């Protein structure tokens, strides 16, 4: 039996797996055979790793494990298009994964940390603080978990968005190892253009991502177009002011030849006026940028509310005068706490209420 400290095979990229097997005397053929079993055949137990050499299988059983995520709680939206999962990790931590079904395609929103250190005031995860980084296997494991759900109904996954719990660029190494697994041609073989990473604006991470050969999409959570307004909503803005952030974004766009998506959560009376839109338009004018406008998902602990539809339209109209395109992101799963961190917070509140009180 492998120990609790044995290597989780899902934490390894294909080169790392090759290095492990090479130390045992097995070559690239055996590496790729095992890799295909994990990511193409979706093996979940060692018994399902049939076809491997008996000696290799024995070494795997003794020295590695197949880490699995377990469903702790799940909710389904009333329209049937959103499936939110609270997944339990080996140490008891829980993370959120959201499966969203659109016409002819499925998208999954995955987490990169248990909790988050960025502290965005309107985000339920930001109110929790950071517990720990996820390992590459825990990040990829969310995709594998969702793939099993989709396969049962004959569906396939098309898009992955790293917009769940946590800041991906705060867990850079593990997140990028997971991305490398997702795009590996012999594994899940996802196209990089179907993967989007969302960041609050970790400037060193944006610049590093620009310098590396991972042509995924980048989305930046902006929410304010002046330093003061942004820092009031996104405390990380105090560490990386807008001039530094926008310089990094321009560097990324020019280096990678890719459009950057900017996320703007519209909060009634806070950042949804024509004046706010003009300031944002001036900030982004001339960039290859697209704004995703997101009416706020109400969150316990934050008293802000979503903008009215007419305010959303007026905001977009102003952006258009600066030739800045925008899209209103459809809110999904409002009835099942599908906003980041909301399901975890709800389940934990219910658990606390159900605990017996001491005499």
From Swiss-Prot:
Additional facts recorded: Reaction proceeds by a ping-pong mechanism involving intermediate methylation of a conserved cysteine residue.
Cysteine disulfide links: 109-340
BP GO terms, sorted: rRNA base methylation; tRNA methylation
Protein name: Dual-specificity RNA methyltransferase RlmN 1
The keyword Iron-sulfur belongs to this UniProt entry's keyword annotation: yes
Coiled-coil spans in chain: none
Localization in the cell: Cytoplasm
EC number(s) reported in the record: 2.1.1.192
Cofactor binding, per record: Binds 1 [4Fe-4S] cluster. The cluster is coordinated with 3 cysteines and an exchangeable S-adenosyl-L-methionine.
Positions that bind [4Fe-4S] cluster: 116, 120, 123
Family as reported in the entry's similarity comment: Belongs to the radical SAM superfamily. RlmN family.
Function: Specifically methylates position 2 of adenine 2503 in 23S rRNA and position 2 of adenine 37 in tRNAs. m2A2503 modification seems to play a crucial role in the proofreading step occurring at the peptidyl transferase center and thus would serve to optimize ribosomal fidelity.
Reaction it catalyzes: adenosine(2503) in 23S rRNA + 2 reduced [2Fe-2S]-[ferredoxin] + 2 S-adenosyl-L-methionine = 2-methyladenosine(2503) in 23S rRNA + 5'-deoxyadenosine + L-methionine + 2 oxidized [2Fe-2S]-[ferredoxin] + S-adenosyl-L-homocysteine; adenosine(37) in tRNA + 2 reduced [2Fe-2S]-[ferredoxin] + 2 S-adenosyl-L-methionine = 2-methyladenosine(37) in tRNA + 5'-deoxyadenosine + L-methionine + 2 oxidized [2Fe-2S]-[ferredoxin] + S-adenosyl-L-homocysteine
Chain positions recorded as S-adenosyl-L-methionine binding sites: 166-167, 198, 221-223, 297
GO molecular function, one term: tRNA binding
Keyword Iron-sulfur appears in the UniProt entry: yes
Sorted UniProt keywords: 4Fe-4S, Cytoplasm, Disulfide bond, Iron, Iron-sulfur, Metal-binding, Methyltransferase, rRNA processing, S-adenosyl-L-methionine, Transferase, tRNA processing
Domain (Radical SAM core): residue spans on this chain: 102-335
Family matches, as PANTHER family: 23S RRNA METHYLTRANSFERASE, RADICAL SAM CORE DOMAIN-CONTAINING PROTEIN
Active site: 96 (proton acceptor), 340 (s-methylcysteine intermediate)
Broad class of where this protein is predominantly found: cytoplasm
InterPro entries: Aldolase_TIM, Methyltransferase_A, RNA_MTrfase_RlmN, rRNA_lsu_MTrfase_RlmN/Cfr, rSAM
A GO cellular-component term linked to this record: cytoplasm
